[in-house]
Every structure is written in C-alpha cells, then in structure tokens.
C-alpha cells in the first residue's frame, strides 16, 4: 500500500463536523461589516516579496523568519501573503481606488507564516480584516472599534474580551522618541537579551514588546512615548477616547502597546482575552497613514484591523459557545422500493424549492428500511420522510421523528412543506 500523504505541519483541515461553527462565524462577520456599509475586496494569495518587505519592514519577525518565499520559473521572488493590509493597499493603488477617495473595505481569506505551530497559532490561518482609506479623523478610528465591539456582541463574547489602546504619534515624534529610547537602552545593554540587542538600532520600539522579564523590568524606567507627543497627536487620541466613552466601549491605555508591523502610526489597539492562555490577542490594528505612499501611491490616511479566525473559533469552543448550531441536515428523504425512488427525489426537490433555507438530504445507494433509517439518524436530521407504496397510493408522506419521542405521522403531500416549515 502506498504511503499515506499527510497535511503539512501547521496547516489544518476544517472537517465537516467543524465547518458549521466556521460558517456561523463567517456569517456574523459578513453581516456585521455589511451593516456598516463596508465592501469586500479579494486579493491574490501570492504577491511580490518586495511588497511585504516594503510594507511590513525588513527588520521584523515576519519578513526575517516567517514568510513563505520562493522563486517562480521566471526567477521572480514571490511570497504567500502573511497578512492582508499590504495586498489591499497594493490593489487600491493599482486600480485607482484610494487617491482623493474614501474607501471602507473588508477581506477574509487564508494567510501563511512559518511559525512554530501551537494552540491558536498555525502556519496557514484565516484572517478577517477591515481597512478604511481617505479619512484622517479620530471618528473613523472609533468606528472600526465600534464595529469590532459589535462583532463580540453578536458572537456573545463581549464579557470575555478587553480593549487596549495606545498612540504611537507621527513620524517626527517617533523619531525623537526613538533616539531617546536608543540612548537609554545603550546605557543598559547588558540587561538586554539577544533579540532586544538586535532590535535596539533597527527597530527599537519593538523592544517595548519584549516578553523577557528582565527587559520589561528595565523598561519601567525607560522614556515614555507620550512625553514626546505634540498637540495634534494628543488631540486625536483624546477625541478617540471621548468617542469610545460616549458609546460605552471600555478600554485600557497600554503605553507598551506598539504592534509588530512597522507601518503603524498614531492609534494602535488590541482586543485581548484571558481565556486562551498565552495567545491572548484576538484582534489587533491601528492607523497606518504612511503605508499607501510607501507603496507608491499618494499620501492617504488609513486605519484598520485584522483578526485570526482560528483563534476566534478556539475562543468560542473554550467558552462552549459552539453548541447552539443547527444540524447539518434537517430532513432526510427515504424511498421504500425502486418504484418510489423517483417520487422521493421529486419530493426532496419540491421541499428545497418551497423552503430555500431547509437542509434536505435524499437517500442514495439503495438499501432496506433499516439501513436507510440508520443513514437518516447518522445524518443528524430531525425527521426522516418515508415514501413507500402505500404512501404513494394515498398521496401522503410518512414522517418519522428522529430526535423526539413522537409517533410516526402521515402528512398529505400538498401540506408537507408547511408541516416541515413549522417543524424546523
């Protein structure tokens, strides 16, 4: 026997028993962004490697360690997309969607990072993101946060997530702070771990995000970014906080929150949970006003967020919010004998036409009554419809209840759709 081929490590199948929860989550996401007037954009999974080097930053974990990069047959360097924002900006620039325009966009699809697989973190993962272009004011920052809060409300997890906020200031403010932070770190270089020493000059703000306990203890005495902000940055952040308070969204200001991508400025945020252990961030984003220009477009203000769907699915399962999902099949249609098979198929088709949301499965492959009932039960259907010679002669259908202790019923064929509609 040939050796069985397995899925690649960190890239998982979503099986039929798991897909209803995914479908429920995806429906909530689509319906919510639709209610805010956002439009979907779909971009290729494979992009030029240079796109991510220029957007994410060459001295980041993603570009240095995690990207799936390869040369195609023309010798061009290509990369499986590790995130969605850069591709969205590239598409916006390429198709003239961004200059002097406002765009509210969303995307959903697979992303790829060569990380160590662990609970809630995979090498292929599915990301949902929101991107807004052309609006520089704090009210749109508040809107994307309100939208994210609405997602938690619809998923029933509002009580299990908290919002952390920070502002990174503009380019000049960060440059002044960067110099002060480097000077401080140079004085305490012996305390820094290897990762922080490497980042000290190339990307010093990422040192603030270090998980090393000694580094975090040192940073308690480090310069504070907010001390370097001018009036515009302070006013923008203050207005955002006022708007969130006005709509009842609670938040915590976290001055160490810097995000892992180079393109962020001003507002940054994360929604975090304590229900998933170390993988606590479930949604993250912020403002990236320089990215469109950085990728060849005209300077355009932008703000957005992204969330990993695997982590949301894991959270829903952890909180046992994955139980209230309807069956994969509502009605299973059986036929007793070859003479009844055609009518059984027609009845199934009539039900699908009359009840578009009903999930109707026809038995295929033959078999006696016992075998068909076994298949019906295994399908998860709440009822099985039995079409035999007697039922056919009387223009009736026998309804066998599979999940309730009820006697079998005979229903007139012309009343069947109404009966099933009330049942499911």
Curated annotation (Swiss-Prot):
It is found in: Cytoplasm. It comes from the Bacteria. The keyword Ligase applies. Signal peptide: none annotated. Keywords: Aminoacyl-tRNA synthetase, ATP-binding, Cytoplasm, Ligase, Nucleotide-binding, Protein biosynthesis. Gene3D superfamilies: Anticodon-binding domain, Bira Bifunctional Protein, Domain 2. The keyword Transmembrane does not apply. One of its GO terms (biological process) is histidyl-tRNA aminoacylation. Homodimer. Belongs to the class-II aminoacyl-tRNA synthetase family. This is Histidine--tRNA ligase.
């Amino acid at each position: 026997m040939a050796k069985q081929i397995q899925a690649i490590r960190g890239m998982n199948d979503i099986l039929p028993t798991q897909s209803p929860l995914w479908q429920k989550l995806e429906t909530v996401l689509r319906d919510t962004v639709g209610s805010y007037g956002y439009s979907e954009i779909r971009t290729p999974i494979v992009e030029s490697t240079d796109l991510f080097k220029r957007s994410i930053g060459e001295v980041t974990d993603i570009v240095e360690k995690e990207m799936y990069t390869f040369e195609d047959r023309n010798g061009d360097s290509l990369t499986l997309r590790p995130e969605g924002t850069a591709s969205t900006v590239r598409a916006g620039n390429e198709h003239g969607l961004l200059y002097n325009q406002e765009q509210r966009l969303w995307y959903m699809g697979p992303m790829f990072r060569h990380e160590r697989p662990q609970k809630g973190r995979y090498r292929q993962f599915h990301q949902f993101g929101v991107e807004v272009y052309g609006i520089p004011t704090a009210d749109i920052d508040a809107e994307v946060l309100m939208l994210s809060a609405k997602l938690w409300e619809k998923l029933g997890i509002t009580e299990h997530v908290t919002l952390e906020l920070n502002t990174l200031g503009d380019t000049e403010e960060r440059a002044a702070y960067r110099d002060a932070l480097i000077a401080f770190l140079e004085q305490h270089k012996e305390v820094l771990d290897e990762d922080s020493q490497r980042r000290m000059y190339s990307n010093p703000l990422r040192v603030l995000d270090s998980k090393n306990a000694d580094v975090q203890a040192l940073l308690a005495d480090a310069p504070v970014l907010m001390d370097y902000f001018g009036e515009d940055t302070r006013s923008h952040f203050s207005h955002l906080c006022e708007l969130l308070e006005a709509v009842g969204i609670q938040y915590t200001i976290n001055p160490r929150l810097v995000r892992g991508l180079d393109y962020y400025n001003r507002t940054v945020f994360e929604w975090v949970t304590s229900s998933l252990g170390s993988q606590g961030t479930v949604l993250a984003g912020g403002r990236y006003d320089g990215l469109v220009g950085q990728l060849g477009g005209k300077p355009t203000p932008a703000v957005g967020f992204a969330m990993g769907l695997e982590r949301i699915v894991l959270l829903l399962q952890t909180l046992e919010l994955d139980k209230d999902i309807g069956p994969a099949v509502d009605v299973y249609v059986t036929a007793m004998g070859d003479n009844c098979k055609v009518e059984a198929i027609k009845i199934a088709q009539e039900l699908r036409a009359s009840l578009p949301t009903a999930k109707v499965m026809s038995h295929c492959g033959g078999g006696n009554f016992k075998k068909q009932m076994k298949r019906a039960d295994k399908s998860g259907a709440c009822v099985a419809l039995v079409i035999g010679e007697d039922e056919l002669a009387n223009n009736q259908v026998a309804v066998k209840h599979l999940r309730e202790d009820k006697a079998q019923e005979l229903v007139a064929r012309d009343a069947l759709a109404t009966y099933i509609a009330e049942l499911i």
